[in-house]
A protein has these predicted regions:
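Strand-helix-loop interaction patch of compact alpha/beta domains
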Residues: 1-107, 111-118, 122, 239
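Short amphipathic C-terminal alpha-helix that caps PH/PH-like domains
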Residues: 120-131
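Charge-rich (especially acidic), low-complexity segments
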Residues: 1-4, 137-243
Length: 243
C-alpha cells in the first residue's frame, strides 16, 4: 500500500495502521464471516465484507463497510460507511440508508466510547454483532412486546435474500458497489457452498404463505410487501446464472 499521499501523517499513525492490517492478516476473522481489504493506493482507507451469521435474519447476506481513517488514528476512530443498500430498506437500527453507522465504539452513539486500544479487528467484530436476532431491540424505546418487532424481522429476512444476496450476487447497478469487486470471489464461494440451505429456507417460507403480505414499520417509514413465491423464482434463476 502506498503512503505517498500521507506525508503529513505521524509515524505513530502509519505504524499503527500497518500493525492493524498485519494483525488482521495474521489473525483473520473469517470464522466470523468477516473479510477485510486495505486500500492499496490510500493507506487511510479500508474495505470490509461481513456475511450475515446463521440463526439470524441476515443469514448469508453480504454487508459492506468502508473505513476512512483520520490523521490522528488511533486517537480518533475511523469514519465507517455502511454500503449495502437497496429498495430504501433500513436493514438495522444502527445502519442508516445514507451510510451512517451509529455505534458507541465509533463515538456516534452513547455508551462506551472509542479508545486508542481499539483496532480494525475490534471495529469489525463490533459491527458483526449488529447482525443479530431481533435487531429492532437496538432501537431506543423498543421492547420485546413492541408490535413492530416481528414484522421488522420478517422484512429483514426477506430483503436480506432479495437485496443482500440476489441483487448483490447479480451485481445490480446502484446496489452492488464496484469498489467491493475484490470480495466477489469470496461471495461466490460462500453462495455456492450455502445455496441449498438458503433455497430450502425460501421453499419452506413459500409453502407456508398463501398470499403476499405487506408490512409497515412506521418508525422507519418502511412499507414492504413480501412475496416468497416471486423470491423463490428469482433465487432459482440466480442459481442457474451462477452455477
Amino acid at each position: 500500500m502506498s503512503i505517498e499521499k500521507t506525508v503529513t501523517l505521524s509515524k505513530e499513525t502509519i505504524r499503527r495502521l500497518l500493525n492493524d492490517v498485519k494483525t488482521i492478516i495474521n489473525t483473520p476473522l473469517t470464522d466470523h464471516g468477516i473479510y477485510y481489504s486495505h486500500d492499496e493506493d490510500d493507506i487511510m482507507k479500508g474495505y470490509a465484507l461481513i456475511i450475515g451469521p446463521t440463526e439470524t435474519p441476515y443469514f448469508g447476506g453480504f454487508y459492506f463497510f468502508e473505513l476512512h481513517f483520520p490523521a490522528d488514528y488511533p486517537h480518533s476512530p475511523p469514519l465507517v460507511l455502511y454500503c449495502t443498500n437497496g429498495d430504501n430498506i433500513r436493514f438495522n437500527p444502527n445502519l442508516y440508508v445514507n451510510g451512517k453507522v451509529c455505534i458507541s465504539l465509533l463515538n456516534t452513539w452513547r455508551g462506551e466510547q472509542w479508545t486508542s486500544c481499539q483496532t480494525i479487528s475490534t471495529i469489525l467484530l463490533n459491527l458483526c454483532t449488529l447482525l443479530c436476532n431481533n435487531p429492532l431491540l437496538n432501537e431506543p424505546g423498543i421492547t420485546s412486546k413492541h408490535t413492530d418487532l416481528q414484522k421488522y424481522n420478517k422484512i429483514i429476512e426477506f430483503k436480506n435474500i432479495d437485496v443482500a444476496i440476489i441483487q448483490m450476487m447479480k451485481k445490480k447497478t446502484g446496489v452492488f458497489p464496484e469498489k467491493f469487486e475484490g470480495f466477489y470471489p469470496i461471495m461466490k464461494e460462500y453462495f455456492l457452498k450455502n445455496k441449498e440451505v438458503i433455497l430450502s429456507f425460501i421453499e419452506n417460507k413459500e409453502q407456508n404463505q398463501e398470499h403476499s403480505e405487506c408490512y409497515i414499520i412506521n418508525i422507519y417509514n418502511m412499507n414492504v410487501c413480501i412475496n416468497w413465491s416471486r423470491l423463490l423464482k428469482n433465487y432459482k434463476d440466480l442459481i442457474k446464472e451462477i452455477v
